[in-house]
């Protein structure tokens, strides 16, 4: 596996591959890779001749500097995992390489990017679109792979792909969960064993809420009240939304696809965890 740090080197390498008629898959990551990322990489390896995995902790999508500072950085271990998964290229640029000057581009796709994470983390999705659009431009992939854990992020990037006319296929891959049901996340490494056990309640109550036959408001209240009742967990938001537009719904008949998206603070630090459940 090649480890590339420069955009020009990446583009030269991929140009050669493309001239040979090879297909290219891109898996954008921020590093601190786990089994969820590995599943995306393996899918790309099976679908494409060449798989590029970007490892870049993107500062423009963090509105909280402390969150950026404590995000795990594990490049050596990440590269070992990628090699085991069969990736051909790890692209690990510096911040200066990606942003030699401040990126002043603005992306706006309401309501998809203005609710939930967009409301709680102003500027977050603008930063996501900045970096992902750059990565798409550098690699010109046939396919790009994203994990469904970040459900809203996928919806926003789909809007951006349509808006900017990228000729690629977006591939959404299922959430990979720990045995407890907790969605795998790089942030899980920041949890103590006790906090990790607490966090398993998030998906447990989401899953249970699909079986109770409640209306939308009752379902919302059931999830929030039960999670908030556990010491060490605090719901920041739980939104039941149209699975395509992410607009909030009031009735199960309001949309063909319905998803519940949640963010919960866990533990004393606290660590912010996201998850979702499909209702319809």
Protein language model features and the residues they cover:
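Nucleotidyltransferase catalytic core that binds NTPs
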Residues: 2-232, 241, 245, 277
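Phosphate/ribose-recognition catalytic cores of enzymes acting on nucleotide-derived substrates
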Residues: 222-280
């Amino acid at each position: 596996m090649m480890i590339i740090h420069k955009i020009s080197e990446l583009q030269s390498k991929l140009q050669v591959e493309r001239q040979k008629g090879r297909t290219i898959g891109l898996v954008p990551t921020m590093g601190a890779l786990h089994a969820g990322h590995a599943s995306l990489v393996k899918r790309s390896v099976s679908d494409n001749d060449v798989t590029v995995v970007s490892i870049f902790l993107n500062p423009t999508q963090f509105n909280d500097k402390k969150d950026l500072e404590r995000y795990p950085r594990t490049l050596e271990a990440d590269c070992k995992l990628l090699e085991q998964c069969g990736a051909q290229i790890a692209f690990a640029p510096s911040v200066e390489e990606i942003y030699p000057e401040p990126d002043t581009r603005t992306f706006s796709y309401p309501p998809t990017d203005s609710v939930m994470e967009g409301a709680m983390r102003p500027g977050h999705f603008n930063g996501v679109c900045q970096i992902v659009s750059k990565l798409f431009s550098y690699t010109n992939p046939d396919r790009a792979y994203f994990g469904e854990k970040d459900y809203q992020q996928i919806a926003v990037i789909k809007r951006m792909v349509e808006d900017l006319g990228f000729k690629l296929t977006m591939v959404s891959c299922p959430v990979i969960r720990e045995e407890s049901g907790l969605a795998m996340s790089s942030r899980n490494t920041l949890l103590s064993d006790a906090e990790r056990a607490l966090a398993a309640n998030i998906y447990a109550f989401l899953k249970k809420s699909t079986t109770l036959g409640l209306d939308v408001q009752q379902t919302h209240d059931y999830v929030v009240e039960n999670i908030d009742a556990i010491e060490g967990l605090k719901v920041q938001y739980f939104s039941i939304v149209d699975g395509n537009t992410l607009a909030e719904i009031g009735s199960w008949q309001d949309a063909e696809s319905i998803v519940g998206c949640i963010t919960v603070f866990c533990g004393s630090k606290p660590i912010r965890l996201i998850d979702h459940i499909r209702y319809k």
